[in-house]
Amino acid sequence: MEGCCMQLPTNVSSLRGTIEVPGDKSISHRAVMLGALASGRTVIDHFLPGADCLSTIDCFRKLGVDIHQDGTNVIVEGAGSGGLREPAAVLDVGNSGTTARLLLGILAGQPFHACLVGDESIAQRPMARVTKPLREMGAHIDGRDDGNYTPLAIRGGALRPLRYTSPVASAQVKSAILLAGLFTDGVTSVTEPHRSRDHTERMIRLFGGEVNVDGLTVSIAGPQSLRGTHIYVPGDISSAAFFLVAGAIVPNSEITLKNVGLNPTRTGIIDVLERMGADITIDHIRNEETEPIGDITIRTSTLHAIEIGGDIIPRLIDEIPIIALLATQAEGTTIIKDASELKVKETNRIDTVVAELKKFGADIEATDDGMIIRGKTALYADGIVVDSHGDHRIGMMLAIAACCAKGTARLERPEAVAVSYPAFFADLRSLL
């Protein structure tokens, strides 16, 4: 499929059915990483076999960890404390910012040298937000623009504890520092301006570690040793978001999504749908290990515009592209603000979302830190060609936009969706 142009479903009269979205990308990454650091075996069920998470597996294999992956099932034979080996080859994170930033935190605590590279997109994403605090802890990191961009060379070991106030609410920054803290003698803490997703904190506890949370400050007392465990990875709410929006805006639709992760640091998309007036219900809420999960049903809804900003942004930052599409089908003017972090994702998602949705006739404009969307707008696809720009979330958003549009549309670089949702197009077809 790479490099081709895919015909998208348009003129869709309804979407109906039940699907189970793939495992959560954030949790899948962390499960492999902590399993690699733990003593003993870790068994991961419902792992996401997307390109990003496979990059994480590849990197830890190069660090000497025995990992067996068969589809959505993964077994990690943990290396234990001090068990990682100096890699003979460069560590290629591919397109995965999570792999890059969290791996830097782990490597900071290792008494050896490693080189980290990625694809063209990663080479443009800022790493100083992670390399700066890790350098303050004592890690030696060199790279382009004083360590702000890959390729990066790192030599770790002999870290000092750090009390760090992060300028951004970023789970990747927080996690990198906490992971380095596992190898540090003393208490290391991170204070954020807003609460970011907390999968790392929950998972460290699942592996037998201790993490303290006090308001916006998370701290860890090191060094700590982890024990292998069993993990069921919930369905990724960021992947579910595309079908939640599709169910709300495509006529005559009803979609049920099974076993979706409902971590409260990730459910901003549900809050937005409810505030806009969506017909949404959540059933069978229960806990799997440390994460809440449930089944979500969404039906075609009459929506109204809202303002989105402030504390909710870290809880839905990855969902903003599909929320922008949602807003085109809501009556009134929706304002998305405080989301400048979108500029340093796989693409500049502010500019990319605006440019691509305008091809469908959306009334949308970019701002310095978000977007303004005026609805409700009929979407048209007069033989248009839209482009994922190699960004998985842009590609999936455009496929849902096409479902609402009259005419015909094709998508360039559809293969990008495999980063987080390899079966996305198959699941979409199953609802037609």
From Swiss-Prot:
Principal place of residence: cytoplasm
Catalysed reaction, written as an equation: 3-phosphoshikimate + phosphoenolpyruvate = 5-O-(1-carboxyvinyl)-3-phosphoshikimate + phosphate
UniProt xrefs under CDD domains: EPSP_synthase
Its EC number(s): 2.5.1.19
One GO biological process term: aromatic amino acid family biosynthetic process
Keyword rRNA-binding belongs to the record: no
UniProt: 3-phosphoshikimate binding residues: K25, S26, R30, S170, Q172, D318, K345
Protein family (similarity comment): Belongs to the EPSP synthase family.
NCBIfam families found in the cross-reference section: aroA
Function text: Catalyzes the transfer of the enolpyruvyl moiety of phosphoenolpyruvate (PEP) to the 5-hydroxyl of shikimate-3-phosphate (S3P) to produce enolpyruvyl shikimate-3-phosphate and inorganic phosphate.
Subunit structure: Monomer.
Designated name of the protein: 3-phosphoshikimate 1-carboxyvinyltransferase
